[in-house]
From Swiss-Prot:
Similarity remark: Belongs to the cytochrome P450 family.
Pfam families xref list: p450
Keywords: Heme, Iron, Metal-binding, Monooxygenase, Oxidoreductase, Signal
Biological pathway: Secondary metabolite biosynthesis
General function of this protein: Cytochrome P450 monooxygenase that is able to use anthracene and pyrene as substrates for oxidation.
Signal sequence region: 1-14
Molecular function terms from GO: heme binding; iron ion binding; monooxygenase activity; oxidoreductase activity, acting on paired donors, with incorporation or reduction of molecular oxygen
Major enzyme class: oxidoreductase
Record CDD domains: CYP_FUM15-like
Protein name: Cytochrome P450 monooxygenase 212
Cofactor: heme
EC number: 1.-.-.-
């Protein structure tokens, strides 16, 4: 009888647990179904084609502005997902319960397939150790020491374009040249390696840079790779997965494979060169590009000196190198191209910004780190562009257990009921509403969709400061927040400011007759109407006081 009693007790406990879990999930699902959202016209595809469409900017605006701070979207085959742009809910996701809310398995697996065990492919304690090792080399103090490297690269860029303009070439693809400069900046400043000499007589395009530039558009077309990478990574040993990819008859997949192979080979080559130089001593290090001040040289030294339990294996250091190059090239260069386009469209702001730069002590050349950050309009132009046009529009999180998201302000359900918090069942797909927070009219005002750098020259609206937006940068969500925020945002900010200071003190920028279209992908990129290749041509001339 005692044995039966224990059995009945165990069954009762199991049934109670299952019933509670079922009720929680039912409640969560009923709340989710009650959240407003745009109508869906396909049970099989939901809003996927609209949201992830390269020309889906209008739909992104509709989601961000028309349905409140939390929006219900339809996924594939009747599944539901959240779009969350409520600051308090985002604080819970990114900071308060960061160990519960993690990147989707497919995202982590894709990064592991492309780079290895890098910062955006690891979780928990593994991620903490990597971040602890990397944080010092992205500090303000280290950025200050890297500034001479930045000017060295950008002054070379200026000479190349100056020669072109003097030769009568007025239409310049600013995306190409900002991309080449970004690659060389992360090469010299990040890896202590020169990818591109940026010489006046060098007309050859950089194949490595071109490959990187084509990767995000290619990734956006390979839906199966992005969605099912966590299954692909489990398909047998590495050699088997490699053979499957080699045989896969898709040009975009082959393009991605080529980029990954190139990054991996170059990272191993650079890493081995650095190890040899460090073993030979300071004199050998000083002879390298960057003179040992680059991120990887310092990181390798720090890793060697770290305690055994904090030390990273060489494979992970190499993975960080590939990630650095990949992440730093497109995001910043595309944002720079966007800024130059906006300045070409807003000539009055271009003139004011040039005046501010020329009135600095260095007149646009070799401005100190402190003075560069005191140029208020330059800072405002960068912040406003990053607010209105975040280069990465879609980042996702999935709760590893049931969670509850509190809201800053209540929302109204489809049935009119007030919703103050949202129960979220384990495994629910959530989109971080970066764009939604950045353009929300309740925070930024009725002109939130207008590019107005001057909004940063006065105190921000009280609604913005009171909202406690959990972003790591300037009350916006562009670089995310919490321990998984973009680690290189200071590097990116300094790069944009140095490029703009040097280029605007020398050149003028105007629109061409060509229609520029921006495409949503992993990183947004521009094309010319009728052409799928990433590019952004502008008319450039010599500035004459």
């Amino acid at each position: 009888m005692a044995a039966y009693a224990w059995l009945y007790c165990a069954l009762a406990l199991g049934a109670t647990w299952y019933l509670q879990r079922y009720l929680r999930q039912r409640d969560a699902y009923s709340v989710l179904r009650n959240i407003p959202g745009p109508p869906s016209y396909s049970w099989a595809k939901g809003h996927i084609n609209q949201y992830f469409n390269p020309r889906g900017q209008a739909f992104h605006e509709e989601v961000a502005l028309n349905y409140g701070s939390v929006v219900k979207l339809d996924g594939m085959f009747g599944s539901k997902l959240f779009y969350v742009a409520d600051p308090k809910a985002l604080h819970t996701i990114l900071i308060k319960e960061e160990n519960t809310w993690e990147e989707p398995d497919a995202f982590l697996a894709l990064n592991q397939l492309m780079f290895g065990d890098c910062l955006v492919g690891t979780l928990g304690e593994h991620h903490r150790r990597q971040r602890k090792m990397l944080n010092p080399v992205f500090s303000v103090n280290h950025m200050r020491h890297m500034l001479p490297i930045f000017y060295n690269v950008i002054l070379k860029l200026r000479e190349v374009i100056l020669a072109k303009v003097k030769a009568g070439e007025s239409e310049i693809d600013v995306l190409e040249w900002s991309g080449r400069a970004a690659l060389e900046l992360i090469g010299q400043g990040g890896l202590g390696y020169s990818f591109d000499p940026l010489l006046v007589n060098s007309e050859s395009r950089n194949e490595y840079g071109d490959a990187l530039k084509s990767c995000f558009p290619a990734l956006s077309k390979v839906d199966i790779l992005r969605r099912y990478a966590h299954y692909l990574i489990k398909m047998g040993p590495r050699w088997f997965r490699r053979s499957v990819v080699d045989m896969y008859p898709n040009p975009d997949v082959q393009n991605i494979k080529e980029v990954v192979d190139t990054m991996s080979a170059k990272s191993y080559e650079i890493f081995n060169q650095k190890k040899v130089a460090l073993k030979r001593g300071d004199e050998a290090v000083l002879r390298q590009v960057g003179e040992g001040k680059d991120i990887m040289s310092i990181l390798i030294k720090a890793n060697t000196a770290a305690s055994e339990d904090e030390r990273l294996p060489e494979s992970e250091l190499i993975a960080q190198m590939s990630l650095l190059v990949f992440a730093a090239t497109d995001t910043t260069s595309n944002t720079l191209a966007r800024i130059l386009q906006l300045l070409a469209e807003h000539q009055e702001i271009q003139v004011k910004l040039r005046d501010e730069i020329l009135q600095s002590s260095a007149g646009g050349n070799d401005i100190s780190y402190e003075e560069l950050n005191r140029l208020r309009l330059l800072d405002a132009v960068c912040r406003e562009t990053l607010r209105l046009f975040p280069p990465v529009t879609t980042l996702r999180r999935v709760p590893r257990k049931d969670s509850v998201l509190p809201l800053s302000e209540p929302i109204y359900g489809v049935d009119g009921r007030v919703i103050n918090e949202i129960p979220v069942a384990k495994g629910t797909d959530v989109i971080i509403g970066t764009y939604g927070v950045n353009v929300r009219k309740q925070l930024w005002g009725e002109d939130s969709l207008e590019w107005k750098p001057e909004r940063w020259l006065s105190p921000l609206p009280s609604a913005v400061t009171a909202a406690a937006i959990p972003g790591v940068y300037s009350n916006i969500m562009t670089f995310l927040g919490g321990k998984r925020a973009c680690i290189g945002f200071k590097f990116s900010e300094m790069e944009m400011k140095v490029v703009l200071a040097v280029m605007l003190s020398t050149f003028t920028f105007e629109r061409t007759e060509k229609v520029i279209q921006w495409n949503i992908a992993g990183v947004s990129y521009p094309t010319v109407e009728g052409n799928s290749q990433p590019q952004l041509p502008l008319k450039m001339g010599l500035y004459r006081p």
